[in-house]
Regions:
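Residue-level detector of functionally pivotal "anchor" positions at catalytic/ligand-binding pockets or at interdomain
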Residues: 294-320
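Short hydrophobic segments within beta-strands
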Residues: 34-36, 67, 156
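Conserved SGNH/GDSL esterase-like catalytic core that processes O-acyl groups on lipids
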Residues: 42-132
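C-terminal tail/sorting-segment detector
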Residues: 331-345
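N-terminal module-boundary/linker segments of secreted carbohydrate-active enzymes
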Residues: 19-57, 269, 274, 278-281, ...
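Alpha-helical cap/lid subdomain in secreted, periplasmic
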Residues: 102-228, 237, 243
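Sec-dependent N-terminal signal peptides
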Residues: 3-12
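Conserved catalytic region of serine esterases and O-acyltransferases that act on ester linkages
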Residues: 219-222, 226-299
Length: 345
């Protein structure tokens, strides 16, 4: 996992949309956004600079950075702050570049950030006790150290994993447990700005855009293309739209957003045919961060054909030869052939 994280750290600076060589302190008039977390922060913010540019924000008028560490929890970041440690990985995602020196968390927060985004480590995201007292401590710390008294503190509700991941939470039940935890802790702490990334992804998993790895590229991290773009849209609509006054959902995706091709590993491309489905999943999550769309919200052409023309169904047996009414999770015998049926979510 640490090796994978280091690879992510290496790749993301190569993908930034920033002003190369421009190093200075941030300006008050900029849109300045800081994520504090881990590789999920990188996934969420990867396409955010592109969206800002698409919405007419000049590259020298915004700044997006991620302070990240592999698997870092709220507890980890609180200790980094308390002990005055230098941030190991500070990634420029796009826009103005910060001064190139070692930063402590307190020093970083003295820059005029408009928004600071917090999150819990994925493996602890549904464990209420892991948030206490660290989320409250982090919120108080951001408010105390921030150069802007009106800084917005947002919390990213992260996504559940595919079942191949070493640790959960997994699938729909995992998403639900994350939601219940975030609802309770955000009420306790008084956080009202929630980025519903996990709900966006779970909505997409109920459509024909779902993939064999549940819209991840490795069971954990978001698939390039559709998944990263959808979560970036949720980030933009939650924390950037109040600053720009423009919705990214009012116009089709740019050619740059559609540039990734499916022949690259882990890519689910954005197309003229699927972007409206992506937008609707984002809109639904923005309207109801703790609820999912109906599985029938986006009937596929294939399902419409099946409904219009009933067909003869082959008998289904389990591996012990028992006749089944429906396919069960696991190995089924259909038409004399072994067929693996995954657990549905």
């Amino acid at each position: 996992m640490r090796l994978l994280f280091l690879l992510l750290i290496f790749l993301f600076p190569c993908l930034n949309y920033g002003q190369e060589g421009q190093t200075r302190n941030l300006q008050e008039k900029h849109f300045n956004i800081l994520f504090i977390g881990n590789s999920y922060s990188l996934d969420a913010s990867a396409d955010l600079p592109r969206l800002l540019v698409d919405m007419g924000v000049a590259e020298n008028e915004y700044c997006v950075y991620c302070a990240v560490q592999a698997g870092a929890s709220l507890d980890y970041w609180w200790k980094v702050y308390q002990q005055g440690e230098e941030i190991e990985n500070l990634c420029q995602m796009g826009g103005t570049k910060l001064a190139d020196h070692a930063w402590t968390l307190a020093e970083l927060l003295h820059e005029p950030w408009d928004v600071v985004v917090l999150q819990q480590a994925s493996a602890q995201s549904n464990q209420l006790k892991s948030y206490r007292p660290y989320l409250q401590n982090m919120v108080d710390m951001v408010r105390r150290e921030s150069a802007k008294p009106d800084v917005t503190i947002a919390f990213q509700l992260t996504w559940s994993k595919y079942f191949s991941a070493d640790k959960g939470p997994y699938g729909t039940n995992g998403w639900r447990s994350i939601v219940e935890t975030v609802q309770q802790i955000s009420d306790e702490v008084g956080l009202t700005t929630i980025i519903p990334s996990g709900t966006v992804i779970q909505n997409l998993r109920r459509t024909d855009l779902n993939s064999s790895l549940y819209l991840t590229r490795d069971g954990v991290h978001l698939a390039y293309g559709v998944a990263q773009y959808a979560v970036a849209l949720a980030c933009y609509e939650t924390i950037c739209r109040p600053l720009t006054g423009k919705s990214a959902l009012d116009a089709p995706p740019s050619d740059a957003a559609k540039a990734l091709q499916p022949d690259h590993k882990g890519v689910i491309p954005i197309t003229d045919d699927n972007y409206k489905m992506i937008y609707e999943c984002v809109r639904a999550a923005m309207a109801n961060p703790y609820e999912l769309i109906s599985p029938d919200a986006f009937p596929s052409p294939q399902s419409a054909q099946r409904n219009a023309a009933p067909r003869q169904r082959s008998p289904i047996y389990d591996i012990h030869g028992r006749l089944l009414r429906y396919r069960a999770p696991g190995i089924n015998i259909v038409g004399g052939k072994k067929v693996f049926t995954p657990l549905r979510h």
